[in-house]
């Protein structure tokens, strides 16, 4: 499966032998990301699970077994990380400070950069799907408005079309840089000297820890 918004159990309904149906979810970029989720559908059997574990270990990846639910495990936590970055952006925190505080907290890339890598249009599709499948208050309307502005009005899809939160130069012609137009999308801009860097760092860590605890509570 290529996305954590496709329920494995639903996909298996069209398969005659549902006990042999199992999800294997990789992360992008695949060549760098060691984690692989193995997703159990409602009727997945032990033989299918064992085969999936063997396959993932054979290619040198680290498998974890999760139950079928929206976002599985990892993307629920990653989604909260990205959402917190968007929340800071809407609060008026300078984009560069958002990115740097996240990296200072130990994250390999900032949430805005990660959004670009995942693709902003995909993020918007997930927001819309969540809103349709659950209830309107399951999503943050301000974050949806931000994604609609970036994707549908500005045509900024992320790295894949060389413009998202960042501008991407042609290969070999410099480094990516935050899009200067971002400030116009912020309802307000806060003075960086008034912001507590430690608080911003902790926010990134706490939201992911809380979401991880929720996945345990939800039996993911």
What kind of feature is each model-predicted range?
Residues 1-220:
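N-terminal glycine-rich phosphate-binding loop for ADP-containing cofactors
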């Amino acid at each position: 499966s290529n996305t954590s918004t496709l329920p494995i159990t639903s996909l298996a309904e069209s398969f005659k032998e549902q006990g042999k149906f199992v999800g294997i979810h990789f992360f992008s970029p695949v060549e760098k990301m060691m984690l692989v989720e193995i997703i159990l559908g409602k009727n997945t059997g032990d033989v299918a699970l064992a085969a999936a574990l063997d396959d993932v270990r054979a290619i040198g990846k680290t498998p974890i077994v999760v139950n079928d639910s929206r976002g599985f495990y990892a993307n629920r936590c990653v989604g909260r990380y990205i959402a917190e970055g968007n929340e800071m952006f809407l609060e008026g925190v300078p984009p560069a400070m958002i990115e740097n505080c996240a990296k200072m907290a130990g994250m390999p890339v900032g949430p805005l950069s990660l959004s670009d890598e995942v693709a902003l249009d995909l993020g918007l599709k997930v927001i819309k799907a969540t809103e349709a499948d659950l209830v309107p208050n399951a999503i943050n309307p301000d974050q949806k408005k931000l994604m609609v502005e970036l994707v549908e009005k500005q045509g900024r899809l992320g790295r894949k079309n060389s413009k998202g939160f960042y501008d991407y130069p042609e290969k070999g012609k410099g480094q990516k840089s935050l899009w200067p137009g971002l400030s116009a999308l912020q309802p307000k801009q806060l003075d960086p000297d008034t912001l507590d860097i430690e608080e911003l760092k902790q926010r990134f860590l706490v939201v992911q820890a809380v979401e991880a605890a929720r996945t345990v509570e939800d039996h993911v």
